[in-house]
Amino acid sequence: AKVAGEPFETELPASTYQATPMPKAIKDISKSKVMVITDGGLVPKGTPDKIVGMAATTWGTYDIKGRDHLEGEDYEISHGGYDQRFVEEDPNRLVPLDALRELEEEGAIGELHNEFISTSGLGNPLSNTRRMGREMVEKVRAEGVDAVILTST
C-alpha cells in the first residue's frame, strides 16, 4: 500500500521512550575522577558475579587498582552478541585501561577510578536495563566519580 501511495497502518509502530536529561558537562576533565562502564560483558575468569551472556539481570564491579593493562588470560566474555576473539586477545580493546592510565599519567584526566563496571547488554528488556542503570548510577555517585566512559561492542 505504501509503495502505491495508498493509506496504510504499520504493523510495527516505532517505540517511544522517555527522554533522558543530559548531565552537565565536565568543566575540567583533568581534575575529574573517571570510571569505565561496559555492556560488553568483560568479567574475571570464572564469572564471579554470574553475569549471563543474554538478558543479564546483574552487573559487577572489578578491581583495577595498581594495574596498567588488562591481560587476556585473566578475563572472559559473558556476552553472546559479538565476535569475542579480539577482546579475549586484548581486553583493553573493550575496557581501555592502558590508554586511560596513559591519560592519567599525562594529567589529561584527574584520576581513573580503581574499578570498572560490566554487564551484558544483549537482548535485555528495558525494565532490566533501567533498573541496572539506576543501580550503577548510585554506585558511581557513591564513589565520587565525575565522568563515565561507556564502552560497547
Question: Would you name each region that the model predicts?
Answer:
Residues A1-T153:
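Metallocofactor- and cofactor-centric catalytic cores in central/energy metabolism, strongly enriched
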